[in-house]
Amino acid sequence: MCYRAHDPKWAFTSTSGAGAAIHGGRFNPKGVEVLYVALTLEGAFLEINQGFALKFAPCTMRSYDVDCDDLADLRTEGGRQVHSVDFNDMACAWFSLAAAGTVPPSWQVVRRLMGEGFAGVLVPSFAVGARRDWANLVLWHRSDRRPHQITVYDPKQQLPTDQRSWT
């Protein structure tokens, strides 16, 4: 089970990575669609608020069922060694580097792992205030079917199917 807090106007696209592709993120270069989900509820709130845990914009919380193969687990030093990833490359100041026209080391890691056939990564949370054991799942390849399955938990079909719910 994973979690994500969404802007309510995008409630109908719970597994899309289009928003992340607009500006890029720590683990996705600009133009690369990716879905970031937290492994804890607390982590999901912290991620959407970028460390401002006591003040946040309206959001809708989702839980997801995940059954995904081809993940690189980078949460531990041992896992990072298996995949030849340096923690400092993941923890880089990706936004500042990208804004200065430099390719962040975290994007280089992503491109290499994608080229090796990975669908995503399990990574520590880098949000300000995150506990050391909080982590995220970052999926470049996802579907509503195996082997890269992620589905939003919505047993009563309450989520809208388009943006007309907000007009």
Write out the residue ranges for each language-model feature.
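Short His-Asn-centered micro-motif
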Residues: 37-39, 123-124
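Conserved active-site and cofactor/substrate-binding residues in soluble primary-metabolism enzymes
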Residues: 39-43, 116
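Short active-site loop/helix that positions an aromatic residue
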Residues: 42-54
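A short, exposed loop/beta-hairpin motif centered on an aromatic-Gly-Thr core
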Residues: 29-38
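Active-site and NAD+-binding cores of ADP-ribose-processing enzymes
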Residues: 1-22, 26-29, 51-167
